[in-house]
Amino acid sequence: MSVYSIRRIMLESYPILFICVLIGLFAGGTLEKSLTGIKGTLVIMMVPLLNGIGGNLGCILGARLGSALHLGTVEPRLKGRVLRKNVHASVLTSIGIFLFISVIFFVIACMWGMGFVMAAKHALAFILAGMLLTPVIVVSVVTLAFLSFQKGLDPDNVVIPIATSIIDVAAAISLLIVAITIVGL
C-alpha cells in the first residue's frame, strides 16, 4: 500500500479527528466552566493566543519529526542528534515567542490603564503559562510521532490533530492555574 493513498489517509484521519473532537469538547467545557467567574478581559484574550501559539509550535515540531522519521534521520527512540536539535529549537522558539507576546500583553495592559504591578502580573502569567505548556508540547508531539510510526501509522495523519487538541486542553489548564495564582482571578 502506498504511503500516500487516499484510502489510507482517510482510514487513519477519521478516527483521529473524532478523538480530537472529543478532546476539543472537553477543552471547551473546561474553559466555559473556568472562565465564567473570570472578569479579566486580558486573561480571556490570552486563551486563543496560547492555544494558537502552542498548536503552531506543536505542528512545527510534529512536521519536522514526521519528515525525519520518513527519511530515516530519526529513529523512534529518545536519542540522537537530530531529535535533540529539533527539541532544543522548539524549546528556544517557545521561550522567545512567549516572552515576546508577554511584553505585548504588558504594553496593552499599561495602555488600558492597568497599574504597573497588575500589568506585570498579566505578562508574567502569560510567560509562565507558556513555559508550563512547552514540556506538554514537546512530550506529546514526540510521543505521538514515535508511537504512530511504530504502529505503522503515518505520523502526518496522527501527530498534528491529536497534539493540537492536547495542547489546547493543556493551554487552558496552565493559563487558569497561573492566572488564578499570579493575577488572583
Give the residues covered by each predicted segment:
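Interfacial loop-to-transmembrane junctions
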Residues: L147-D168
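Short hydrophobic "helix-edge" motifs at membrane interfaces and signal-peptide entry regions
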Residues: I44-M46, V142-A145, N157-V158
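A cytosolic-side transmembrane-helix exit/cap motif
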Residues: I60-A68, V139-T143, I177-I180
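Alpha-helical transmembrane segments and their membrane-interface boundaries
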Residues: M1-G115, A119-A123, I127, M131, ...
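Transmembrane alpha-helical segments of integral membrane proteins
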Residues: V136-Q150
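Short alpha-helical linear motifs
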Residues: H70-L71, I108-A109, L144-S148, I182-L185
